[in-house]
Each structure stands twice: as C-alpha cells, then as structure tokens.
C-alpha cells in the first residue's frame, strides 16, 4: 500500500493535508492559477510547457472546439496533462474545465437547448439526464470541472445572457439547477468524479451594465442566492464561479462578505471557488480596486477565491514575493491550495488523470440514448403562446410558404455556449465572450454583414462548412418539413434578416404567401457570443421587440388573410 498522499484509502481531505506540507511556495502558487492555451498556443506544446514550470491548478479547454476529430481531443488532453505532471515536483495533475450549459465543445458531443428553453419544460428528471450525458462525454475527455448550471435569476429580457439562465423564477431555477448538479456529480465516469461549477454568484443579472449591483440583503438571499442554496443543500454542489459585478460597491470576486461569510459560513458551501475569465484582473482594471494587480489578487485570495482563471494576472510573481517576505500571511494561500488539492483527490485525478482512448472514448459519444434525451429536451422546450384555430394545419393544404433566415439554415438552431456557436466564433471578427479576444481566421478577407447593421453574417461558405463538419446530419426546418410531408409543396423565401430594417426580400416572400394555403414565419435574431450574434454575452438589447424588418413583414403578411404561424 502507498504511503502518504498516494494512499487511496485515506479521505481526500487527509491526502491533501499531507501533500500540502511537502509543497514549495512555487508549487502552491501554481495550484491557484489557471492556464489558457489560446489560438496558436493551443497547438504549441513547447509554449504550453513554458507556461507552467511548476504545474498548474486548472487548464482551459475552450480551444478543443477547433479539433475536428474526437481522438485528437483525447490526445491533446493527455499530452497537456503529461506536461503538467512532469513539471509539478509532486506530479500533481491539473483539473481540466469546460462549459456544460448546452453540451461539450467537442466534436461529436451531444447538443442541448439553452437554459431558458429547458426551463420551459420544467422537467427536473430530464435536466438530470442531460447533465449525465454532458458529464459522461466531458469526463471521457479528461474534463472534471463542468462550468454549469447557470443559476442567475434573470428578470430583464433585454439582458443578452438571459438565454443561458432558467429565467426569472427562483423556485424553477432551484429545481432544475439542483437536478443538473446531481446529474454532473453523482457516480463515477471513466474512473473520475466530475464536479459542477454553478455561476454567476451573485445577482449578476440585477446589475447595471454587468458592473455594479445595488441589491438589498433580503432580495439577495431570498431570490438571487436561492438556486445556489438549493444546489448546495440538495445536490452537494462542489464548485462556484462568482460574477463580474460589484455588490454594494465591493467586487464579488474580492468580497469576503459574499464568498466567505455568506457562501461558506451561512450557506454551507465546502467546495472550490474559481474566478470567471479575467475577473481577478477586473477587480483592479475595471473596478479600480487595489494599487496593483497583485494587491487586488491578495484581496481575492482573502475573500475566498481559490483559483484565478484563465491565466495569471493577480495571483502573480509580485504576490508570491509578498508571501515569501511575510507581507501576506501564507496561511491564506495554504487554505486555498488545500481546497484545490482536496478537489483533485475527490475527483480521482491522481489515479485517473488522462482522457480515455479508442473504443472506451467512443462509447461515451456515439450513444443513441443521448440523442433521444436531446430530442426530448428540444420538444419539451416548445411553448405554444396562442392558437386561434390555425393549428393543427388542415390536411387539405397542399402548398405552404416557409419564410425567414432561420428556416433554410440549421446553423441558427445553435445559440450561445453551444459547440457550433463556439466554432463559429473562430471565424468572428470580434468575440463578445468575456476574457476571450477576437479571432484571426477572417483577417484580410471581406466581411459580409447583415444589411444596415454591424452584425457579421453567417451566410457564407466558411459557416456552411462548419455545419457540415459539426452536425452533418442536422437538417434545416425546411428540409425537415419536406421530408416529413412529401405530399405538400413548400415554397421558401428569405424574406428578412435577423436584425435591421432591410425590406429587399419582402416582395418575393409576400408573393410566396399569396400563392400558399398557409405560411410559417421564423422570427427573432441569432443568439451567440460573437460578432455574428444579435443577442448574447456582451450583446444586450434596448427593448424586447422583434427586429423592425420582421415587425413590418408580419404586418404586411397579415393583410393577405392567410393562416400565419410564427
């Protein structure tokens, strides 16, 4: 039997205590930092090696989105983990993290509807099954921190990120969030235990410009903290990601009141607290707290922020020096490292650090049951707001017009935080996702925009190719209708774009409706995280109306007195 921290018979906490006593200051600082190999760095193992000379706490896997073969995903994780363990004096493996809201950003992973869509179904049992699929697929690739559920209570539909949430009701968010957390954390997958990281703690959607929140204590606890409390109490939530905003003038990432007194002492949270991307740096650069980034980093550590992501800003060499010379109490750092190590032992990473290979890997992905769960979730997300006798359509109808930019492209089915969206953003002239810069794939190429707007169009060859690679079997609405109803003639017309006032397609579309027995209109914008989206992270709205061109088209189409479905 192994002695010391390698003894698997000891509880994770005890193993962590033993290992902590053996570690140097350099190795401890490595454990509270993350690394994000972005763009070209993702493929450069020598550069990745140089980024973590003493190992690392966490590794971002966002750029796995670029890999078009599942086997390459597993190989990348294994190669990077080997570097981490080689460089760490005690061969401590890294936690690999990935988003989990709509499925993994991995080739052949199962995709799911957004949080707001799944909330429409109010089905905790299904939510737990979704989480189990996400957990199985990410764990197979060596990923054990899953950045979901999104437990923000969102009461203003102009907020671009509302689509990620379960909506405005804390009871609903509590039920679904707890179910999702259970699905992620229960049982072992590939010899490992995955852990859920709920976000964004706290009252993020009750802030002004995502920066400052004036939320009274009672509202904070009874509404905004309720889903987090439920996940902690009912599902044993092991991970928290604080929000970017300040609460009553104090950045959440640097707030002892929020991250320790409320979260740990009152709510009973015992897991790991990791920063949102760039949040520790934002304490200094955006909120203007602390004379230096290191001082802001020290404040975040004292507040209870265990790991800085995605790269080192505040938990830096200057802060290390402060621990070295006694300016800062090393017991603060030790408390953080102890929680990180405990999580790694709890996850089983010391015994199972690498992604699966071969058939074992494929079994987690090529799974008919996962597809059925995805379909059921999509069906339950549908809401019929009004029906004045138009539905179901009469069988005597022989010709139906299908109008709108979403109808002839399956790309627009995939909103923010889906794999499709993240791959699309590698061809975006600008990223709106926090902590991630714009990409270079379209440099020196002519950029097509939605007429009359600054929104980059996805109706080009590059994005057609992405769909064929990502979801080769995914049919558009028009294709599905034609397949399901071969006896009916469907007339397609583009009609109008996802935003703006362009009316150039009206004549053709109105003519199609005039010739048809009924018309199906696809309405709304495109949800995402980059310059191709009309709503999403970093892309808010001034109102909740449809785009002007779509409003005008509906008014014009209604004059034709044909049944309209939108």
What are the residue ranges of the model-derived segments?
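Glycoside hydrolase catalytic-domain context in secreted enzymes
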Residues: 1-566
């Amino acid at each position: 039997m192994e002695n010391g921290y390698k003894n698997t018979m000891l509880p994770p906490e005890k193993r962590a205590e033993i290992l902590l006593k053996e570690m140097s200051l350099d190795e401890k600082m490595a454990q509270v930092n993350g690394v994000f190999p972005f763009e070209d760095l993702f493929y450069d193992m020598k550069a990745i090696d140089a980024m973590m000379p003493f190992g690392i706490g966490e590794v971002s896997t966002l750029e796995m989105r670029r890999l078009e073969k599942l086997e390459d995903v597993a190989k990348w994780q294994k190669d990077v983990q080997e570097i981490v363990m080689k460089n760490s004096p005690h061969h401590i493996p890294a936690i690999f993290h990935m988003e989990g809201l709509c499925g993994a950003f991995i080739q052949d992973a199962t995709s799911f509807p957004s949080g707001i869509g799944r909330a429409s179904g109010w089905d905790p049992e299904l939510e737990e099954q979704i989480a189990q699929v996400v957990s199985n697929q990410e764990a197979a690739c060596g990923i054990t921190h899953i950045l979901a559920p999104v437990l923000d209570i969102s009461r203003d539909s102009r907020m671009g990120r509302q689509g990620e949430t379960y909506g405005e009701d804390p009871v609903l968010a509590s039920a679904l969030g707890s179910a999702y957390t259970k699905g992620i954390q229960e049982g072992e997958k590939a010899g490992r235990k995955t852990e859920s990281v709920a976000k964004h703690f706290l009252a993020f959607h009750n802030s002004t410009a995502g920066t400052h929140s004036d939320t009274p204590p009672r509202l904070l606890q009874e509404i905004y903290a309720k889903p987090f409390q439920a996940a902690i109490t009912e599902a044993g939530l092991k991970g928290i990601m604080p929000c970017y905003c300040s609460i009553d003038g104090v950045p959440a990432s640097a707030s002892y009141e929020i991250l320790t007194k409320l979260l740990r002492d009152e709510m009973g949270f015992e897991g790991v607290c990791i920063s949102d991307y760039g949040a520790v740096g934002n304490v200094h650069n955006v909120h203007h707290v602390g004379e230096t980034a290191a001082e802001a980093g020290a404040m975040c550590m004292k507040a209870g922020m265990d790991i800085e992501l995605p790269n080192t800003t505040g938990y830096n060499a200057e802060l290390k020096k402060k621990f070295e010379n006694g300016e800062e109490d090393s017991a603060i750092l030790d408390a953080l490292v102890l929680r990180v190590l405990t999580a790694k032992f709890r996850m089983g990473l010391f015994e199972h650090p690498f992604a699966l290979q071969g058939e074992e890997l494929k079994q987690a992905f090529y799974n008919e049951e996962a597809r059925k769960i995805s379909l059921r979730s999509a069906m339950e997300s549908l809401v019929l707001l009004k029906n004045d006798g138009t539905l179901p359509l009469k069988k005597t109808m022989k010709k139906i017009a299908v109008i709108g930019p979403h109808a002839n492209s399956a790309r627009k089915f995939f909103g923010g935080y889906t794999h499709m969206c993240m791959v699309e953003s590698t061809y975006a002239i600008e990223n709106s996702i926090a902590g991630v810069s714009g990409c270079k794939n379209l440099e020196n190429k002519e950029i097509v925009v939605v007429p009359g707007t600054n929104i980059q169009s996805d109706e080009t060859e590059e994005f057609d190719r992405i769909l064929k690679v990502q979801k080769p079997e995914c049919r558009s609405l028009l294709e599905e209708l034609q397949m399901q109803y071969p006896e009916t003639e469907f007339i397609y017309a583009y009609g109008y774009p996802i935003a703006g006032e362009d009316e150039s397609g009206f004549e053709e579309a109105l003519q199609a409706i005039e010739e048809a027995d009924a018309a199906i209109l696809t309405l709304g914008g495109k949800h995402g995280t980059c310059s191709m989206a009309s709503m999403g992270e970093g892309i808010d709205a001034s109102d909740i109306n449809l785009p002007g061109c779509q409003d005008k088209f509906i008014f014009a189409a209604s004059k034709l007195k044909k049944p309209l479905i939108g």
